[in-house]
Amino acid sequence: MSTQEATPRDDAIRLLARRDYSRSELMSRLAARGHAPDDIASLLDALADEGLQSDARFAEQFVRSRLSRGQGAMKIRAELGARGVTDEVAREALEGEAPDWHRLACEALAKRFDSPGRDPRERAKRERFLASRGFDFEQVRHAMAHAWENTR
């Protein structure tokens, strides 16, 4: 069966067999394959009812994946939002993992840099690194003060 002959359900099942997708991502991918928007909407409702597609499950897996990469809450929340996950579902997924954000920021910083830096320019570079990873100001300050305590 070629992609042109595949039903929206066939395409959705094929996509979901590889990994979870948010409802929004799945809708975009099915629309790109030429399926009618009305067919896609009813299919996504049916898949959710059957437990085959869940934004909550997608968000939980996404959060675990991003935490293992050393990313902060702000970046994870923004990426989930870009994938069409609601703020409430994103918040619940982050709370479900309950990571120690300060420890995670310290680990990410110590892994990337071997010292806090000798001058303000080097310290600013380290702070920008953590901010780009999605850590907030308090977490960045904590990491700059404590990231290398166990390595000395």
Swiss-Prot record:
GO biological process: regulation of DNA repair
Keywords: Cytoplasm
InterPro entries per the UniProt record, alphabetical: RecX_HTH_1st, RecX_HTH_2nd, RecX_HTH_3rd, Regulatory_RecX, WH-like_DNA-bd_sf
Subcellular location, principal: cytoplasm
Keyword Cytoplasm: yes
A Pfam family matched in the record: RecX_HTH2
Disulfide-linked positions: none
Subcellular location as annotated: Cytoplasm
A GO CC annotation given for this chain: cytoplasm
Gene3D superfamilies: Winged helix-like DNA-binding domain superfamily/Winged helix DNA-binding domain (1.10.10.10)
Alphabetical list of PANTHER family matching this protein: REGULATORY PROTEIN RECX FAMILY PROTEIN
Role noted for this protein: Modulates RecA activity.
Family note: Belongs to the RecX family.
Full protein name: Regulatory protein RecX
Source organism: Chromohalobacter salexigens (strain ATCC BAA-138 / DSM 3043 / CIP 106854 / NCIMB 13768 / 1H11)
Lineage: Bacteria, Pseudomonadati, Pseudomonadota, Gammaproteobacteria, Oceanospirillales
